[in-house]
């Protein structure tokens, strides 16, 4: 999840901790079930003294704002009283049929808080923005609750790292790679997101028994253990 601080006086964006936000979102990523026409995201104003406006919109995979498209967010702007909770509805349009139906499509959901105008002079007001990944998952590839498809990933040992193969129709975000479960969870690693049916090379030491951590649909961070046969490594299946 990305949170950006926006200075209302046109000062450039920069990343901050989400703990500073007044308007919060109930998740760090969203999966839109293609068998449904809509879904809702819960939002809340965690400030108990001041009302805030909440502005919502969708971006495409290139992080370009889309006014009309396969998925829209409503209402685009709403007022949240102090301590109040509300929701944003994501709905599909007829353009949804133009998306591939055999793999996921990537969008971004944005939520920006707009603080009330200060009555004091020379006060710089600050707005915070939350951005999360929004995956549209067509009905044809609908998954079961808690289904693990990430265990289809393949690691190929190459010079200076691994080439990760993602043969699935889903996006996979890899956040760790190491020679132990702890190293995969806590070691330094540059996060990569693999598109459906793609491969990507990452820098890493080579391990006899690699471990890989990823982000699942719920924001959890499970770890997979691999078994290698030569330079090719596949996930160790639980019996």
Curated annotation (Swiss-Prot):
S-S bridge residues: 228-233
Primary localisation category: periplasm
Alphabetized UniProt keyword annotations: Chaperone, Disulfide bond, Fimbrium biogenesis, Immunoglobulin domain, Periplasm, Signal
Effect of residue 29 to A/G: Loss of chaperone activity, no interaction with PapG, no longer suppresses PapA P pilus subunit toxicity
A GO CC annotation given for this chain: outer membrane-bounded periplasmic space
Cellular compartments annotated: Periplasm
SUPFAM superfamilies: PapD-like, Periplasmic chaperone C-domain
GO biological process: cell wall organization; chaperone-mediated protein folding
PROSITE patterns assigned: PILI_CHAPERONE (PS00635)
The UniProt record lists the keyword Glycoprotein: no
Superkingdom of origin: Bacteria
Signal peptide start-end: 1-21
Family: Belongs to the periplasmic pilus chaperone family.
Note: PapD donates its G1 beta strand to complete the Ig fold of PapK (donor strand complementation).
Free-text function comment from the UniProt entry: Binds and caps interactive surfaces on P pilus subunits to prevent them from participating in non-productive interactions. Facilitates the import of P pilus subunits into the periplasm, probably also facilitates their folding. Chaperone-subunit complexes are then targeted to the PapC outer membrane usher where the chaperone must uncap from the subunits. Coexpression of this chaperone with individual, otherwise toxic, P pilus subunits (tested with PapA, PapE and PapG) suppresses their growth inhibitory phenotype.
Subunit organization: Interacts with substrates PapG and PapK.
Protein name: Chaperone protein PapD
Organism, scientific name: Escherichia coli
């Amino acid at each position: 999840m990305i949170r950006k601080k926006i200075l209302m006086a046109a000062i450039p964006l920069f990343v901050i901790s989400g703990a500073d936000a007044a308007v919060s979102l109930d998740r760090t990523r969203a999966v839109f079930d293609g068998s449904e026409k809509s879904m809702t995201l819960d939002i809340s104003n965690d400030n108990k003294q001041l009302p805030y406006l909440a502005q919502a919109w969708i971006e495409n995979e290139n992080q370009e704002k889309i006014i009309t498209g396969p998925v829209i967010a409503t209402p685009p702007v709403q007022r949240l009283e102090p301590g109040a909770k509300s929701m944003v509805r994501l709905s599909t349009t007829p353009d949804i049929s133009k998306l591939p139906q055999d793999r996921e499509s990537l969008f971004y959901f944005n939520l920006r808080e707009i603080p009330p105008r200060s009555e004091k002079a020379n006060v710089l007001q600050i707005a915070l923005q939350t951005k999360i990944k929004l995956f549209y998952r067509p009905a044809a590839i609908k998954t079961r609750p808690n289904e693990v498809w990430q265990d289809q990933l393949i690691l190929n040992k190459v010079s200076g790292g691994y080439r990760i193969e993602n043969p699935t129709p889903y996006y996979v975000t890899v956040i760790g790679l190491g020679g132990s479960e702890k190293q995969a969870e806590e070691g330094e690693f540059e996060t990569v997101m693999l598109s459906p049916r793609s491969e990507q090379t990452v820098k890493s030491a080579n391990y006899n028994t690699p471990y890989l951590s990823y982000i699942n649909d719920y924001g959890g961070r499970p770890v997979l253990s691999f078994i290698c046969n030569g330079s090719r490594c596949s996930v160790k299946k639980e019996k």
